Amino acid sequence: MATNKFFKSLLFTLTIAISLFGLSIENSSAYPVFAQQGYSNPRAANGKLACANCHLNQKAIEIEAPQAVLPNSVFEVTVKVPYDTTRQQVGANGKKADLNVGGIVILPKGFKLAAKNQIPAEVKAKNKGVFISPYSTEFDNILIVGPIAGKTHQELIFPVVSPDPEKDSDVKYLTYPLYAGGNRGRGQVYPTGEKSNINSFGAVQAGQISEITTSEKGESNITIINSDGVKTSQIIPAGLTLTVKQGDSVKVDQSLNIDPNVGGFGQEETEIVLQNPLRIIGYLGFCFCVLLTQVLLIIKKKQFEKVQAAELNF
């Protein structure tokens, strides 16, 4: 257990370090790796992925994977995270920034991230600057990536190696489910439960806005006086566009700013078959027998036609 926690902490630190050194990380971030800190298993019993707890908007993704694979073979699982690259969102510092993307793939037990020497050169070129890692030592079949620049990585490619049932008795030749998730942009909730600045902030009480001031950091301080003369102040983070002005009357929970969220999270699932090579050989043998039978029938038919023609001539 202690080793697992140490691995998580080390992996988290390494990912953040890579982010700081600029391997395709930009100002506005989406961190799938944060899920490691709060969830031992990122997939809940109802099928919901942990990423959806922070990224509240739903956005579509696509998953591409082979229908069937052979044991001990390397293949690709591609998660497509499409979005309008011309759009920007509010960064943590309140400034406009491009969106980043992140992704997660939950493979069947026994399937793992392919080793560097197993990954084709073409995939290495596509994944240059991309750090893909297992979720934990316990769940090495779960792979995560991000944040990476969305403009250049709307397709997340996960190189995977399949297990060999001949070497692992826990693995069988079966059809397995495969789950994937992808997000673009920052989340609306931090892992601590606090709201980020990618939110619509509502009025804490009904009343009239008596004053709006702006701090040096760009934050808006809105003062609301209710009918009893009670004043409340609330701060709207920097970078958000207000929808109210001084003198306006507001209701409880009425939005005070335009919703800045342009991102979102989506998840999909598919199936993959771990195919027994003997079944393929058997199928090919069956096809050969059928083909041979058809050829022999045609030859026999030709011979019969010749015999009939000879008898008629006689």
From Swiss-Prot:
- Quote the record's cofactor note: Binds 1 heme group covalently.
Compartment(s) of residence: Plastid, Chloroplast thylakoid membrane
Signal sequence span is 1-30
Q: Which Pfam families match?
A: Apocytochr_F_C, Apocytochr_F_N
InterPro entries (UniProt xref): Cyt-f_TM (IPR024058), Cyt_f (IPR002325), Cyt_f_lg_dom (IPR024094), Cyt_f_lg_dom_sf (IPR036826), Rudment_hybrid_motif (IPR011054)
Instruction: For this UniProt record, give its keywords in alphabetical order, as a comma-separated list.
Output: Chloroplast, Electron transport, Heme, Iron, Membrane, Metal-binding, Photosynthesis, Plastid, Signal, Thylakoid, Transmembrane, Transmembrane helix, Transport
- On whether Kinase is a keyword of this UniProt record, the answer is no
Molecular-function GO terms, alphabetical: electron transfer activity; heme binding; iron ion binding
Stretches that traverse the bilayer? 280-299
GO BP annotations, alphabetical order: photosynthesis
Q: Please name the Gene3D superfamilies in this protein's record.
A: 2.40.50.100, Cytochrome f large domain (2.60.40.830), Single helix bin (1.20.5.700)
- Give the way it sits in the membrane: Single-pass membrane protein
Query: What domain of life does the native source organism fall in?
Result: Eukaryota
Name any cofactors this protein relies on.
heme
- List GO terms (cellular component aspect): chloroplast thylakoid membrane
Positions with a binding annotation for heme: 31, 51, 54-55
UniProt key word Thylakoid:
yes
Query: Partners and quaternary state?
Result: The 4 large subunits of the cytochrome b6-f complex are cytochrome b6, subunit IV (17 kDa polypeptide, petD), cytochrome f and the Rieske protein, while the 4 small subunits are PetG, PetL, PetM and PetN. The complex functions as a dimer.
| Family affiliation | Belongs to the cytochrome f family.
What is the role of the protein in this entry?
Component of the cytochrome b6-f complex, which mediates electron transfer between photosystem II (PSII) and photosystem I (PSI), cyclic electron flow around PSI, and state transitions.
Q: What is this protein called?
A: Cytochrome f
| Source organism (scientific name) | Trieres chinensis (Marine centric diatom)
Q: Which gene encodes it?
A: petA
